[in-house]
Swiss-Prot record:
Gene name in the database record: HSP90
Name of the protein: Heat shock protein 90
Protein source organism: Encephalitozoon cuniculi (strain GB-M1)
Compartment(s) where it occurs, according to its Swiss-Prot or TrEMBL record: Cytoplasm
Domain notes: The TPR repeat-binding motif mediates interaction with TPR repeat-containing proteins.
Upper lineage: Eukaryota, Fungi, Fungi incertae sedis, Microsporidia, Unikaryonidae
InterPro entries reported for this sequence: HATPase_C_sf, HSP90_C, Hsp90_fam, Hsp90_N, Ribosomal_Su5_D2-typ_SF
Primary location: cytoplasm
Membrane-spanning intervals of the chain: none
NCBIfam families assigned to the protein according to its UniProt record, in alphabetical order: PRK05218.1 (NF003555)
Length: 690
């Protein structure tokens, strides 16, 4: 645009001769584009058509007494239902209901007019009459669900009858025309039968097993019963001839044993009607009044677990949206619970009893992968295909609320000691993951669910609250020891200096992960006894002279060990062990060093290998004879001899403290050389063996 050209402003230009035109529509192209682009999967057609049938039944139910007063002949409300009838011979799939049916204007306005929703209009009419509760369960809203038929059908016949009108047949191939004619088949009171003529290549939708699978996935909790027809083989009873009956009568009279001839079983094929959606939406009921067996059956259906659940709870949440949460904790962990490649789909979202998604993204944290259940709402804003949620309010509400509710559930479970033992054995690591990721404000509430064995707990694991209650006078820290097995932590030489105090055993990888986030509990610092920063209640002034007397010796040991250690000191609190290895305050712990070194990426990456090394503190026991001997060598300036002993001593202490040696072959060579040295040589000469 040139600098002197005036911009076009709305309303600036008026043309007295302007013409108004309607948009022209290429119906064939639009239908094809709409059908293929709206739905991500062809199987969704069945969800849409079942939902339409459910709405039709709801409408009849809402208008039942009005229609009766008008003299309409109606099926009993209790008989309302949906049938899905596959016919492989005719290549047809029929979805049939005995709901409200449609009049000719309905067919033209809502089937013949794209994106015009009869259900939406019905809902609005009921709301105007003050009967919105009667329409609260209606699913449809966009007026497009019917056209999903053409995902799998080349032609659709819609046979329908409104209670106050004649039966009609609507037919179309999904192109630019449709026909409506009177139905002259078998009479029926009301309802709709949708006959789909299945396309080539879509035969899977004629398989009763596939039909059942799709219905269970999307429409399992639709209020009305959904039936399909299944072909089965049953044993055909064999009619006995008169002479055989006579023989049996004679044998009964003689009562003599006889050998019966084994006859080949004759099987015949029969077609039986089976209900697919046996389970009911339990979140619509008071969970305390639901029988245990019904809850167990529901749990197995939504979770896919073969065993019963350990705990169940229900919450109704009111916020920007109204949602129900029905959650279950299983008895045992799935073998693939922490498999990063497997999507966590144990919690499912339902809107008006129809499945929407099991993908909550980051709204459901990884640690909750053991929980199964349902998030349900009747007022979730949906996108046009009803596969995704519009906006973020639902996910925000789930993300904020659900983890807190699960920990409430776990807290209730902890009141039953035996059940909680089962839970903690299976899912304790999930709790630790949650605590490590939680904010500081949440951590205390979550961490009270932890249970640990300690140096003084005996056979019963205790909570952190119990530990704090039992802390020594003036003890400010919670003492913990970490490792990779029970045996390793129980035998760690660092415990030698803590015989007066209770120390918590943490022997799982997830403990290390948790401690990276959990620094305090109820104001008490959580302190590894193998890390720098330990504060003991006792007065350490009496040890100052001992420490001072070893200062020069410690400097020399540091010079000899060089980069292998960050610091060398003496620890007068040690009792029976000659030395321990601890780590500096902000370094990796010894356990984390071992974990990182065991990872394949560390072996292949020199930089990763370099960072997977903790900064070590060599703490020697000044009262141990071995340390006294080394100091005596230092004092007498026998440095070479001291070096040789110190090298073996240090690496032995590393092993004793659970570290993995970087050069085990070199260590063995040093030990063998030491064993052959003068220090351990026999005084009497040994005769050479011939």
């Amino acid at each position: 645009m040139s600098s002197n050209q005036e911009p076009l402003v709305e309303g600036k230009i008026k043309d007295k001769h302007s013409e108004t035109h309607g948009f022209e529509v290429d119906v064939n192209q639009m239908m094809d584009t709409m059908i293929k682009s709206v739905y991500s999967s062809k199987e969704l057609f069945l969800r849409e058509l079942v939902s339409n049938s459910s709405d039709a039944c709801d409408k009849l139910k809402a208008l039942y007494f009005q229609l009766r007063e008008k003299g309409c002949v109606l099926d009993p409300v209790t008989s309302l239902g949906i049938e899905i009838i596959p016919n492989k011979d005719n290549r047809t799939l029929t979805i049939k209901d005995n709901g409200i049916g449609m009049t000719k204007p309905d067919l033209m306005n809502f089937i013949g007019t794209i994106a015009s929703s009869g259900t939406k209009k019905f809902r609005e009419e009921m709301k105007e009459k003050g009967n919105s509760a009667d329409a609260s369960n209606l699913i449809g809203q966009f007026g497009l669900g019917f056209y999903s038929s053409y995902l799998v059908a080349e032609r659709v016949d819609l046979i329908t009858k409104h209670p106050s009108d004649e039966a009609l047949v609507w037919t179309s191939t999904g192109r630019d025309v449709y026909t409506i004619e009177e139905y002259d088949g078998e009479p029926f009171a009301h309802g709709t039968s949708l006959v789909l003529y299945i396309k080539e290549g879509e035969e899977e939708f004629l398989d009763p097993k596939r039909i059942s699978e799709i219905v269970k996935k999307y429409s399992l909790f639709v209020f009305y019963p959904i039936y399909t027809y299944v072909e089965k083989e049953i044993e055909e009873p064999e009619e006995k001839k008169d002479e055989e009956k006579e023989d049996e009568k004679v044998e009964e009279e003689t009562a003599e044993p006889r050998v019966e001839e084994v006859r080949e079983k004759r099987l015949k094929k029969v077609t039986e009607r089976e209900q697919i959606n046996v389970e009911k939406p339990l979140w619509k009921r008071n969970i305390k009044e639901v029988p245990e067996e019904e809850l167990k059956s529901f749990y197995k259906t939504v979770s896919g677990d073969w065993d019963d659940f350990l705990a169940v709870d229900f919450w109704h949440i009111e916020g920007l949206l109204s949602i129900e949460l029905l959650m279950f904790i299983p008895k045992r962990a799935r073998f693939d619970m922490f498999n990063k490649n497997k999507k966590n789909n144990n919690i499912k979202l339902y809107c008006k009893n129809v499945f929407v998604t099991d993908d909550f993204g980051d709204a459901i944290p990884e640690w909750m992968s053991f929980v199964s259940g349902v998030v349900a709402s009747d007022d979730i804003p949906m996108n046009i295909s009803r596969e995704m949620i519009q906006g973020t309010n639902v996910m925000k509400l789930v993300k904020k609320t659900l983890p807190q509710k699960i920990f409430e559930m776990i807290g209730k479970l902890a009141l039953d000691a035996e059940k909680y033992k089962t839970f903690y054995k299976e899912f304790g690591n999930c709790l630790k993951m949650a605590i490590g990721e939680a904010s500081e404000g949440q951590q205390d509430g979550y961490a009270k669910c932890l249970r640990y064995f300690t140096t003084k707990s005996g056979e019963e694991a205790i909570s952190l609250d119990t530990y704090v209650e039992r802390m020594a006078p003036n003890q400010k820290q919670i003492y913990v020891i970490t490792g990779l097995s029970k045996e390793q932590v129980k035998s760690n030489p660092a415990l030698d200096a803590f015989q007066k105090y209770e120390v918590i055993y943490m022997h799982e990888v997830m403990d290390e992960v948790m401690l990276r986030g959990l620094k305090k509990y109820k104001g008490h610092t959580i302190q590894r006894i193998t890390s720098e920063g330990v504060e003991l209640p006792e007065d350490e002034a009496s040890n100052e002279e001992v420490v001072k007397s070893f200062e020069e010796f410690c400097k020399k040991v540091k010079d000899i060990l060089s980069s292998k250690v960050e610091k060398v000191t003496v620890n007068p609190r040690l009792v029976s062990v000659p030395a321990v290895i601890s780590t500096t305050k902000y370094s990796l712990s010894g356990t984390m060093e071992n974990i990182m070194k065991s990872q394949p990426v560390t072996e292949a990456n020199p930089f990763a290998a370099m960072t997977a090394v903790s900064k070590k503190i060599f703490e020697m026991n000044p009262n141990h004879q071995l340390v006294k001997n080394l100091k005596a060598l230092f004092d007498s300036n026998e440095i070479e001899k001291m070096n040789r002993i110190l090298e073996v001593f240090f690496e032995t202490v590393l092993i004793h403290n659970g570290f993995v040696l970087s050069d085990p072959k070199g260590f063995c060579a040093n030990v063998f050389d030491f064993l052959c040295s003068e220090e351990v040589r026999c005084e009497e000469p040994v005769e050479e063996v011939q």
